[in-house]
Amino acid sequence: MSDFTQTLDTDGLATITWDCQARPMNVMSKQGFADLNALINGCLTDPMVEGVIITSAKSDFAAGMDLAVIAETKDMHPENPAQGCFEMVMEIHQILRKIELAGMDFKTKKGGKPIVAVLPGTALGIGLEIPLACHHIICADNPKAKIGLPEIKVGIFPGAGGTTRLVRKMGAMAASPYLLQGKLCSPSQAQAAGIIDAVSTTPLEDAKAWILAAKDTDLVKPWDAKGYKMPGGAPYHPAGFMTFVGASAMEIGRASCRERV
């Protein structure tokens, strides 16, 4: 059975629900991405679909990527495992970019379908990277939930766009604790930091209302809009350059301290 299923209501709103039934929390697999991609394709081409909600049937959204996928991909490409992993990551990028553009004409920035992520609870790794590609992120008012990109803690980095989207959304300095330290936060902290858009006691209802009220301009990511400037300065802007230099020095120092303890 697929980890992703879809329903369509009378308002033309499709709800894609993630539910890995054999696991206590959702984790992403290669087949899971293929299933999600197929549903997104269907929603974007179906004239009956006005907008999409991506959510979870569980009390949490997702624990991240199934790390076994990396090992499996390497085994499938013994002659060049690095190339195999690269191609897999690029396929994931294409799926998330498809969600981000949502069928819009890139020149006119019109014609897209609004896609909202509704997080009932914890969203980690790919469980946050998928929402970051959506046009609006609403998290349930769940104080036990944790939101973040903890990949760095196991020696990898958020390879599905988390590094680029979070930096472009928040700026390098603000994003660095989440990317370089794997910092996790509560829904209210994530909203205050600008990672998610809203915390709600009725997230599904709020998502439907947002979709029905959304305009073309609401679907355009800041970094796709004309005149976009990265918060805090781009890497080679004077302010941005100092951020990158300072962040590198601080992380090297922090890592050295941990090694000595």
Predicted regions and their residues:
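Conserved CoA-thioester-binding segment of acyl-CoA-metabolizing enzymes
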Residues: M1-T55, E79, G253
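Intrinsically disordered, low-complexity segments enriched in small/flexible residues
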Residues: L13-T15, K30-A34, L39-I40, A174-S176, ...
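Glycine- (often His-adjacent) and acidic-residue-rich active-site loop
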Residues: S56-I95, A123, K153-G155
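Glycine-rich beta-to-alpha active-site loop
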Residues: I99-V154, Y178
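Hydrophobic, secondary-structure "cap" segments at the distal end of domains
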Residues: G162-M173
